[in-house]
Structure formats: C-alpha cells, structure tokens
C-alpha cells in the first residue's frame, strides 16, 4: 500500500520536508517512489505537483494527516471526483 507522507530534509533546527509517495513499510528517510511536493514550515512555502498527487490518490494512495491538511489548504481535493474522497 502506498502513502503520501512527509520526508524530512534540511539541517538541524531548520527542517524542510518533501512530500513523497512511499511504501507503507518504508522508514521516514527510506527510498521513495516519487517526489510529489515540497513543504517549508518556517517560510510557510509549499510546492505541489498536482497531477502526480491526483494520479497517486486515484491509484489508492492514502495521505497522512499532516499531508492531508496541506492538500486541503492548497485545494487539491477539489479536483478529485466525489467518490474518491474516502481517506482513513
């Protein structure tokens, strides 16, 4: 099963995160399938590859809670079909 989750990058006290599609059993810094976005909580910047995100969501990938909040703020779920909105 796939998840869309945050992968920590950056240095000490200056964390930035990549939003990646990754297997559920992999570690946080494990090998990802594809990078689909970027999130900087300090500068409050977000970059999302919406086409890749929609592809993985339609394939059954589940976003984590934090990633789901980021997607809601960006309006990614407005582009999904209504029957695709079931997340755990």
Curated annotation (Swiss-Prot):
Keyword list, A-Z: Chloroplast, Plastid, Ribonucleoprotein, Ribosomal protein
Gene Ontology MF: a single term: structural constituent of ribosome
Protein's UniProt keywords contain Transmembrane helix: no
Pfam families assigned: Ribosomal_S16 (PF00886)
Gene3D superfamilies per the UniProt record, alphabetical: 3.30.1320.10
Gene Ontology CC: chloroplast; mitochondrion; small ribosomal subunit
GO biological process, one term: mitochondrial translation
InterPro entries: Ribosomal_bS16, Ribosomal_bS16_CS, Ribosomal_bS16_dom_sf
Compartments in which it is found: Plastid, Chloroplast
Domain of life according to the entry: Eukaryota
Keyword Plastid tagged: yes
Family: Belongs to the bacterial ribosomal protein bS16 family.
Name used for this protein in its record: Small ribosomal subunit protein bS16c
Biological source species: Coffea arabica (Arabian coffee)
Name of the coding gene: rps16
């Amino acid at each position: 099963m796939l998840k869309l989750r945050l992968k920590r990058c950056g240095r000490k006290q200056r964390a930035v995160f990549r939003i990646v599609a990754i297997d559920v059993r992999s570690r946080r810094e494990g090998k990802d399938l594809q990078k689909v976005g970027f999130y900087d909580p300090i500068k409050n910047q977000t970059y999302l590859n919406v086409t890749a995100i929609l592809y993985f969501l339609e394939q059954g990938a589940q976003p984590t809670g934090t990633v789901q909040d980021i997607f809601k703020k960006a309006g990614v779920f407005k582009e999904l079909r209504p029957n695709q909105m079931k997340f755990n």
